[in-house]
């Protein structure tokens, strides 16, 4: 009996030890893990000195002081209004932070005039977490009240704003004092003058219920007497604000803010920088958004030109277009962060913003705005004249706090994150140099491309100043679906198996047919090749899908593609993990909403409820959003294991396509911090020796990519927008090869239209193929891929590639330097090597520049031929 007892005790001790080890591993591996913090970037502010304007022997802006100068520009400051002016030495044009004649604007009301004259506007919630509709504007609440100071920076100026209405009926006599502070002041005043101490005590009454003292009256005689008592101890305005804040009385401290804005001139650019670490909030206010430089370079009613916005591939909003009754343009950079609001519905689809840029082009200036820092928090806003003023303008705003509206007991409440995101809100305004034909969006695209090349974010495929025309076949981009999970039954039990839609051998047969059709360069994105197929298990391990073939067959396929100038990329998802993924702990490793604490998930949009968490009957469709905290564990492990598989590269399904934060209350990770982590992981994958292909291609990923698929080639047709432009393509052409969405994935395919659009955009044809018929995926999570059978699309693929190749083979490494529309429906695209391509979209012939173009055709001129 004793022996049995010992055994039981021993087993219990062993079980406790095992449980302890499991708990130790769990907490160490998940709760106490802090390795991700090493990826966060730190930034330092430039040193400042006492403000002193520069000597200006040749003043260019009357009434303004010179504060900085470069070879191209001069920066001026109005010391009375904080208005800024940039004088372009090359053209003689002057650009103001806001129009000088703002007060004469007959269309703008006083509220909008205050907005126009403000360099920054602060949107906030009050102490009850309710949004205050009218923001605090730097002109109305700082400049007009003379609450601003200047400090000099190297080649710039620092402006410090104190935004608030500090006027009080009682002056600096506090309305409220905490019990402890009242006793302290009473003792000090009595020691200095006993009669004044008695006066002080007579005019403050204790509110025992609320725990503080209140001034008996705010009448002038009482205020004078108490002020005289306070003067005996040298009471100051700083003491006044400190006492109000410490009193604990609701509303005692007036709402106010402090903000610092650095304005620096660098070569051909003006840099505006507002560090959030210098944003201070008082009176229970909680800043959730900041708008900067709303009217910088704004154009009036008599000017001609347009605003450039990063809507999909890019689009134009023409000045004075008569659309003042439509909704203003606003889009979030890199799309909306799902974790920022807790809204789980999607009522419309928008082309995402891939580039943190905007611009304004008029007859006398072309300005590109680049959001250098804080881009993950930014939205681009634009508006035309006659809506709120006589001006057309575009500007960025930044969301610094996430908030959710929660429904509780028939009511609702707003929950807002306690801390602002720590980041620099930095905008670089690049002033384009005037060309013979004036300014255009082509110049802005060139400015952005040059800027990125100088930073190392883009690397030219050919020589930087390529003049000679060379010929190189373009690639055909091919998504090949390999393993697809499908539901099967065994003895009545349901389980998931893998259906091999395209084996490695069958992929070779597809390539054979393409070669017979003349397509000799193919870049393959192989999907569903490992860890259970398309909706794969956690990618920290790599197990090839055996039904597709062996590793040697996969590597042989890669060798074959590389031999003809192509490539084989193997697809992987890092930021989204399927609900059925093995090796992933969704309840712990996923991002969470700040307000509700729920795990963040994403599926398809339910057409009835519009919720984007629908499974449509296939649970593998629903994905967890992986917390940035744990992202590096998967990327580092995957990169290490991929070195044992000899293929060209890695295709990133989501790492270059979307960006999300983590609202977990005890360990929040902002979207700005998430970007630091993602960029670090792109670097890890890049250093693995594999080439990288990205889907979507957000701008922060360009530095690491060889190829981009599903690049934005369209724009969202907002009411205020007038037309789309291939701005995205104009920036990256000649540095990264790219394609749009798979041509056979949509429902409005036209072979002729596809050819013309590819030729115009410089994008390469892209298809998605399966060897088996698409009907075999009808009852799977990929049932939206209903038109993938290669035999149905082989003729189109070869024909489209042949036509597009005949035009674009001359410009594979050249920059797209100009795009114009010389006639309705006719586009002219000029490349850096002198090649000019005309595209006629019209259903009838056209004559342009002395050339005859057939209906729905293109014409390529190489070296004038």
State where each predicted segment sits.
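N-terminal Sec-pathway targeting helices
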Residues: 1-16
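N-terminal accessory beta-strand-rich subdomains and adjacent acidic, glycine-rich linkers
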Residues: 10-12, 21-468, 855
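Soluble non-cytosolic domains of exported or imported proteins
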Residues: 72, 438-442, 497-505, 548, ...
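Conserved, mostly hydrophobic/aromatic
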Residues: 72, 274, 514, 758, ...
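Active-site-proximal substrate-binding groove within the catalytic cores of carbohydrate-active enzymes
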Residues: 77, 82-89, 351, 360-397, ...
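Conserved beta-strand positions
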Residues: 292, 524-526, 570, 652-654, ...
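An active-site-proximal structural segment forming one wall of the substrate-binding cleft
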Residues: 447-458, 503-506, 510-513, 626-650
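Aromatic-lined carbohydrate-binding/catalytic grooves of carbohydrate-active enzymes
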Residues: 471-559, 564-630, 657-661
């Amino acid at each position: 009996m004793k022996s049995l007892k010992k055994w039981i005790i021993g087993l219990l001790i062993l079980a406790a030890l095992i449980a302890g080890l499991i708990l130790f591993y769990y907490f160490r591996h998940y709760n106490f893990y802090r390795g991700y913090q090493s990826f966060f970037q730190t930034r330092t502010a430039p040193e400042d000195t006492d403000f002193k304007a520069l000597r200006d022997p040749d003043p260019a802006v009357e009434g303004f002081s010179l504060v900085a100068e470069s070879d191209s520009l001069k920066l001026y400051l109005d010391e009375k209004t904080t208005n800024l002016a940039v004088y372009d030495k090359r053209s003689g044009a002057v650009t103001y932070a806001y129009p000088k004649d703002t007060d004469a604007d007959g269309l703008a009301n006083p509220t909008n005039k205050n907005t126009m004259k403000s360099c920054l506007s602060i949107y906030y919630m009050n102490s009850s977490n309710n949004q205050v509709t009218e923001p605090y504007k730097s002109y109305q609440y700082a400049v007009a009240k003379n609450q601003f100071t200047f400090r000099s920076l190297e080649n710039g100026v620092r402006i410090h704003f104190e935004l608030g209405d500090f006027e009080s009926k009682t002056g600096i006599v506090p309305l409220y004092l905490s019990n402890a502070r009242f006793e302290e002041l009473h003792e000090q005043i009595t020691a200095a003058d006993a009669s004044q101490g008695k006066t002080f005590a007579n005019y403050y009454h204790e509110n025992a219920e609320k725990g503080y003292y209140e001034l008996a009256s705010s009448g002038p005689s009482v205020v004078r007497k108490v002020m005289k008592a306070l003067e005996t101890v040298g009471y100051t305005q700083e003491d006044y604000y400190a006492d109000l804040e410490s009193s604990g009385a609701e509303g005692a401290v007036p709402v106010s803010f402090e903000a610092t804005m650095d304005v620096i001139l660098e070569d051909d650019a003006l840099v505006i920088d507002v560090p959030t670490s210098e944003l201070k909030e008082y009176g229970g206010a909680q800043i959730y958004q900041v708008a900067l430089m709303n009217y910088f370079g704004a154009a009036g009613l008599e000017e001609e030109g347009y605003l450039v916005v990063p809507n999909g591939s890019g689009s134009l909003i023409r000045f004075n277009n008569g659309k003042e009754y439509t909704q203003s343009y606003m889009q979030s950079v890199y799309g909306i962060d799902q974790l920022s609001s807790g809204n789980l519905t999607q009522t419309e689809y928008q082309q995402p913003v891939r580039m943190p840029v905007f611009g304004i082009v008029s007859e006398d200036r072309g300005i590109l705005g680049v959001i250098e820092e804080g881009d993950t928090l930014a939205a681009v806003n634009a508006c035309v004249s006659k809506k709120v003023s006589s001006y057309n303008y575009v500007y960025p705003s930044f969301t610094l706090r996430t908030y959710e509206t929660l429904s509780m007991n028939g009511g609702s409440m707003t929950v807002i994150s306690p801390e602002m995101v720590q980041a620099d809100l930095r905008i670089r305004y690049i002033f384009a140099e005037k060309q013979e034909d004036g300014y255009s969006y082509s110049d802005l695209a060139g400015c952005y491309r040059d800027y990125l090349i100088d930073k190392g974010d883009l690397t030219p495929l050919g020589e930087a100043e390529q003049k000679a025309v060379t010929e190189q076949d373009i690639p055909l981009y091919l998504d090949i679906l390999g393993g697809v999970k499908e539901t099967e039954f065994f003895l009545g039990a349901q389980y998931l198996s893998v259906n091999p839609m395209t084996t490695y051998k069958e992929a070779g047969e597809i390539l054979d047919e393409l070669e017979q059709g003349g397509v000799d360069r193919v870049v393959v994105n192989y999907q569903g090749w490992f860890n259970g197929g398309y909706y794969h298990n956690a990618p920290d391990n790599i197990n090839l899908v055996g039904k597709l073939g062996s590793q040697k067959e996969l590597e042989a396929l890669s060798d074959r593609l590389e031999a003809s100038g192509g490539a084989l990329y193997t697809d992987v998802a890092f930021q989204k993990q399927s609900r059925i993924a093995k090796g992933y702990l969704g309840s712990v490793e996923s991002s969470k909403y700040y307000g509700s604490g729920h795990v963040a998930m994403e599926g398809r949009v339910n057409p009835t409820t519009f919720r984007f968490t629908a499974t449509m009957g296939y649970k593998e469709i629903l994905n967890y959003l992986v917390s940035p905290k744990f992202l590096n564990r998967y990327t580092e492990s995957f990169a290490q294991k991929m070195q044992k598989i000899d293929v060209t590269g890695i295709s990133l399904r989501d790492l270059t396509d979307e960006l999300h934060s983590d609202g977990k209350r005890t360990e929040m990770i902002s979207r700005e911090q998430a970007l630091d982590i993602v960029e670090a992981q792109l670097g890890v994958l890049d250093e693995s020796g594999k080439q990288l292909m990205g889907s979507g291609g957000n701008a922060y990923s360009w530095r690491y990519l060889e190829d981009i698929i599903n690049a934005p080639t369209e724009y969202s047709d907002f009411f205020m927008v007038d037309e789309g432009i291939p701005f995205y393509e104009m920036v990256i052409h000649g540095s990264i090869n790219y394609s749009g969405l798979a041509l056979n994935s949509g429902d409005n395919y036209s072979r002729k239209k596809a050819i013309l659009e590819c030729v115009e955009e410089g994008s390469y044809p892209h298809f998605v193929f399966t060897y088996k018929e698409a009907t075999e995926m009808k009852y799977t999570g990929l049932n939206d891929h209903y038109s993938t059978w290669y035999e149905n699309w082989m003729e189109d693929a070869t024909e489209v590639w042949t036509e597009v190749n005949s035009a674009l083979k001359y410009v594979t490494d050249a920059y797209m330097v100009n795009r114009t529309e010389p006639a309705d429906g006719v586009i002219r695209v000029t490349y850096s090597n002198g090649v000019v391509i005309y595209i006629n979209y019209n259903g009838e012939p056209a004559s342009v520049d002395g050339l005859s173009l057939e209906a729905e055709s293109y014409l390529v001129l190489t070296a004038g031929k």
